[in-house]
Amino acid sequence: MSFRPIKEKKSAQPFIEGAGVSLFRAFGFRDPEECDPFLMLDDFRNDDPEKFKAGFPWHPHRGIETITYVLDGTIEHQDSLGNKGILSGGDVQWMTAGSGILHQEMPLGNAKGQMHGFQLWANLPGSQKMVNPRYQDVSHSDIPLLEEDDGSKIKVVVGGYKGVNGPVDGIAADPQYFDVYVPPNTKKEISVDAYRNCFAYIFQGSANFAYSSKPMGVRIEKELNGEELNIRDLSGNRTLIRFDSGDSISLYSGENGVRFLLVSGKPIQEPVAWHGPIVMNTREELTQAFSDLRNGTFIKPLH
């Protein structure tokens, strides 16, 4: 087994999006290759309705897929295909924008005025950028939860883990998307296919994802099963960790445990032309998309 070392660790940055929604961006709009095939991850977590209720009014997308995962609160959505609905805590929505879609997402929060969820953008390869748009809404009750002997809990949102498959399928990036909880002071190893790019996003508690590489020149603070363990630098809330190559990730959770998203996907390795909500392969395709918007031809006939 080859553990994935950390390639990069950074904190999510505050952003204002939509009509004035305060959120934290883990990555996106900097280097489209850094998490290929994924383009962006937003953490929309807020206890003040004034900072999210303006929402994300009608806007276009082309050339991408989005995966929205709601932890708490509700989101009302509708689109140019005539779909309409409400996502509640634990629900997931996958949208393939393909050739073009207009939609809006309006966070409503919970009874206490709180809202928390994530939206991940995945790129589409050039051969699929103009496919028909489509939606898939998945109820929290349909998302399998694995409870392991060490007390860990893994929700399999997309992809498969230990023979259990998540309900969301058909995404071009062939992702694995897990919501992972590891109890306090626990060593955990999770397999990730070696051909995938992989990242973790911590949103509760803390953990050390780097100890397995046995870094030199740092203070050793603990011992686990006879192994020296470096826990000097725990990664905590709103931390993104990008992993290098290997076939598994390894961590040791902090005194309050840790909860994080673990996401991986097969890199597309194609040119990216990206502006706002539209992602194509060339500048010419991008220019055409915005011309279609201006001319009223953005929404294509289904085929």
Show where each model-derived region lies.
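Jelly-roll (double-stranded beta-helix
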Residues: 1-303
